[in-house]
Amino acid sequence: MPFQFNSDPAHSDAQPAVCAACHASGRGCLVDVRVNRVKGRDTQFQIVQQRVMDCALDGFVPGTDGDPDPSRAFLEYRAQAYANTRMAGSINFSGFSLSQQQVAKVDGDIYELMEAAALWNAAAVWNNFMDTGNWNSTVFTRPPVAVPTPTRKVAIVKMSRGGDTTKLLNDAARAEYRAFEVALQSGGMELRLSTPDILGLRIPNPMPPGFGIFMNPLPDLTNASQAILEQAWTGIQSTLEGRHFLFAIAVKTSTRSDRLYQALFEANVLKYILGYVLRGPAIKFHAHLETTKGSDVVGRYKAASMISLLAGGTPNKAIDDLYLALRPRDTAQKILDSLPSYPL
């Protein structure tokens, strides 16, 4: 299915024909819940977010090589996908109505997925350059100080909701973390390693088998590509030490005032456990938002890292970089440009 449908209604690729066939096959992007409506809710239709992406982005990954216009904003891709979805509803259901609330329920996840896919493809370009010395992208620009070094390949990994970061640790590192956990539990305390939305990792050398998947870009955001993106972290479990963690990214379209401190807490915990308990280098923590309106994100995210204050010397921010992630290409380029700065 195309990102934008043929405007000729008689064409075989016109939306009425495509959406009707999709719905008839049981692969539609909407679920009619009017019959089995949840008590106390007025929801009539629910969006199947995987199918929305599978339909709208079955030919390219936004902001990367293969995208007909990689300069577009995240918002433009999502707006077109939702327009396709609304039209599909009008084609397939009488009395169709889709509330903005239903769109909002999937919007953040789709935004995060698009960013993760763009970063994945940027990392694949980087890894090819590390191995061959050839820059094979026309969308991304090679960081001028990047030195092709096969041992400096990276994996930029989308973590699953509720995933356990400690599962990525090898046996020795997990034992160190477990000893730390047990010591706290003996005093009735805990400090769990949080799971960010996206992790940037140095691929171990020699490369474990599960990392081979990060050498190739995703061609699109079909269901198959989404599954790769969502499940890749499970294939690299039990492989990492603290030194392999480069950066973490919290991805949100926006953040409410009552959620401001969640990222700050996650950043401090990650930096303490990875830097002190597991004796890795200083991990960097990024917050990527589409808008900072509605809360004092800029002011609050100037907070110093508690770890750097306790260590003395020059303090650092808990959240190293607050970035307005408006376009997938620019967002991925920013991360690419930072990769040469990691000493190890």
Locate predicted features:
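Well-ordered, non-membrane alpha-helical segments in soluble/globular domains
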Residues: I110-A116, A263-L270
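Acidic-basic catalytic patches of nuclease active cores, encompassing PD-(D/E)XK
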Residues: S94-D220
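Conserved catalytic cores of phosphodiester-cleaving nucleases, focusing on short active-site segments
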Residues: I198, F247-V251
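Alpha-helix termini
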Residues: W126-N128, P206-P208, T234-T239, L270-G280
